[in-house]
């Protein structure tokens, strides 16, 4: 492999993608963050959050997806198997390590200027993480910050995976978002 056309990450996976981007030697052409959790939370608070988040995700497995609507904005039957599998596979140690390495209360890592200009930080206007958008905009002033009007956390990729994939292909091919009816002007 000599290059990556796109690095895409969602939710808490944004931390992992950002770590990859700051360390990889491979050229990356475009980056798309969908509802990235760019919260900056102190270590003690993250430690307190760990058992609660662990139980919430495990409950998806124990309830066969019945708690999905309480945890996420939707309970679409098509996504339940993924969340059930995640709940089944999750260990407390993995959850603790993930939170130890994520959402840290420290400055955002810098990106090369050229890559920053080809990076999209998308947020749904209805998602809780929208509140982090302003701090991300300050850290990466040359990036694009599209808002999906009326959408919740990761709603487009969950409710229309094929449409989301077409949008990402468009980003790869043209370096911009296509016209989308819910894209805030």
List the predicted regions and their residue ranges:
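Catalytic histidine-centered segment of alpha/beta-hydrolase-like enzymes
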Residues: 151-165
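Conserved alpha/beta-hydrolase catalytic His-Asp/Glu region
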Residues: 60-113
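Flexible "cap/lid" loop of the alpha/beta hydrolase fold
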Residues: 22-58
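Alpha/beta-hydrolase-fold serine-hydrolase catalytic core, especially in secreted/extracellular enzymes
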Residues: 176-185
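Conserved acidic catalytic loop of the alpha/beta-hydrolase fold
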Residues: 1-5
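Catalytic histidine neighborhood in serine/cysteine hydrolases
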Residues: 140-154
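Conserved serine/cysteine hydrolase catalytic core
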Residues: 100-138, 156-157
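Gly/Ala-rich beta-loop-alpha elbow adjacent to hydrolase catalytic centers
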Residues: 8-13, 17
């Amino acid at each position: 492999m000599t290059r990556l056309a796109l690095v895409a990450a969602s939710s808490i996976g944004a931390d992992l993608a950002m770590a990859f981007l700051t360390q990889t030697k491979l050229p990356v052409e475009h980056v798309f963050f969908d509802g990235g959790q760019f919260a900056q939370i102190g270590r003690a608070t993250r430690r307190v959050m760990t058992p609660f988040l662990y139980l919430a995700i495990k409950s998806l497995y124990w309830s066969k997806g019945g708690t999905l609507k309480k945890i996420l904005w939707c309970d679409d039957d098509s996504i339940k198997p993924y969340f059930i599998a995640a709940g089944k596979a999750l260990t407390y140690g993995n959850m603790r390590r993930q939170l130890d390495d994520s959402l840290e209360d420290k400055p955002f890592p810098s990106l090369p200027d050229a890559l920053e200009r080809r990076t999209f930080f998308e947020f749904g206007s209805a998602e809780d993480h929208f509140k982090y958008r302003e701090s991300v905009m300050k850290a990466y002033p040359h990036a694009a910050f599209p808002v999906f009007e009326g959408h919740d956390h990761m709603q487009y990729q969950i409710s229309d995976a094929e449409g989301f994939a077409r949008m990402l292909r468009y980003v790869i091919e043209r370096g911009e978002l296509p016209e989308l009816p819910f894209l805030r002007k």
